[in-house]
Amino acid sequence: MSELTDWGRPYFEASGSSADIFYVAYGKPPSSWDISGSKYSVSGIPDGIEIHTYGPTTHPETVEEFKKGYLWESLLERKPDLASKVAEQTECLIIRGSLNDPVTLNYFRNLVGLIQWLFDRGIQGVFDPHAFLWWSAEEWNDVFEKSDTALHSHVMIFTSPENGEEWAHTRGLRKFGRPDLSVRGYPVERTTDVGNLINRFIGMQALGAVIPEGQEIKMQGFPSEMYCKHKGHLDDPDFNNVHIEIIWSNSKSSN
């Protein structure tokens, strides 16, 4: 096998956190695991990651677990073709585990390639519960084929009104062993600016940066005295992760 490209973390600082992986792949499991390392950029299944299969005779309720509720209803509305394919499946694989504060992103490169291989073997759809993100084969392939790591594609930014202001927050950074992000109390006209700020922090953290408690944010056009505050817990339903609250200094709801 030719040498694979390293996915580095140039900003890495030890955090003591674990990268937590959770994917559900719907469709018939492959009969053999003959993955071409050079084609899919896979050197192996990362240590700490396990793959379990479920179907009609093995905990069939697990296959149906994510085919209900708000996220499923949203998928039916937004991506009916993908929802139809997933709904027909009676088997799935769950890819799950954790890695202690990885120094590189090679584990994630391996996972991206593994899931691409599963799609090429007939898997019909993949759900990322950490990011609340459903993937079709075409969408995953678009990311897989990109020349860069496309890490932002694996983290979602959600926005919603709150107390007459806006709230933006992420889901999905747990797969990189870093806190998710939240900005509350900004005016709606600043949504694009806040999105750019969040994307900057997503990239830094995915590449290994650790944002310290009280980190000040000084950017042109933003309020003075903005800073970062670590909050939450891994079972927080809004994030399924701990998070960093970016305090918008003159808001009513972020403090």
Language-model features, listed with the residues they occupy:
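Short secondary-structure junctions
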Residues: L4-R9, I35-S43, G208-I217
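N-terminal alpha-helical "arm" segments
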Residues: M1-G27
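N-terminal low-complexity, intrinsically disordered segments
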Residues: S18-A83
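Internal, hydrophobic cores of structured domains that mediate oligomerization or house catalytic pockets
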Residues: P56-F158
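Short beta-strand-to-loop capping motifs
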Residues: A25-K28, G97-L99, G185-V188
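Aromatic/basic-lined ligand-recognition segments
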Residues: F132-N255
